[in-house]
Amino acid sequence: MGTRKTEQPPLWVATADLPSSPGHPFYSKLSAILDAEGFDRFAEDQCRRFYAPTMGRPSLEPGRYFRLLLVGYFEGLDAERGIAWRAADSLAVRRFVRLGIEEAAPDHSTISRTRRLIDVDTHRAIFTWVQQRLVAGGLLKGRTIAIDATTLEANAAMRSIVRRDTG
């Protein structure tokens, strides 16, 4: 049986000494496709009118913002808090989003603010561009999209139930 080590852990560790893995194959392939097509430059060009060149605090880069939204989409995260947490937690996602090991993940409020800053048409244009590149790169088949929208009646409060036959 092993025993707990009592030695003091090192205070500084070089990033080259940190254990690394090849990363998530999907994000590696996705990143390669987006990089080859110039995604970050395209996103910056599309979003240029929403960013002031000299005013305010530094904002989230458009390429990084849309990469975060892609992570949220592919992992089923519908809240900015979940996207920010995932970016802070996963090294593969950090690599895809272009976050260095020493950089903090964007705060959920920054993601939310950026979402409100950029209009719907620009979001649609960028996601359409990404979708076309992913179909061409073989990550999406591009044949059909299924949407499930089921409407269900719900009883909000059991005390307010009224029988239909007696009114």
Give the predicted meaning of each segment:
Residues 1-44:
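Charged, often Cys/His-bearing segments associated with DNA-binding zinc-finger transcription factors
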Residues 35, 56-64, 79, 103-106, ...:
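Secondary-structure capping and boundary motifs in well-ordered enzyme cores
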Residues 42-45, 69-70, 94-112:
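Peripheral, non-cofactor segments flanking catalytic/redox cores
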Residues 43-57:
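Short, Lys/Arg-enriched N-terminal segment that forms or immediately precedes the first helix
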Residues 64-77:
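Alpha-helical support elements that line or immediately flank enzyme active sites
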Residues 82-96:
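DNA-recognition alpha helix
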Residues 99-167:
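Active-site- or DNA-interface-adjacent structural scaffold in DNA-acting proteins
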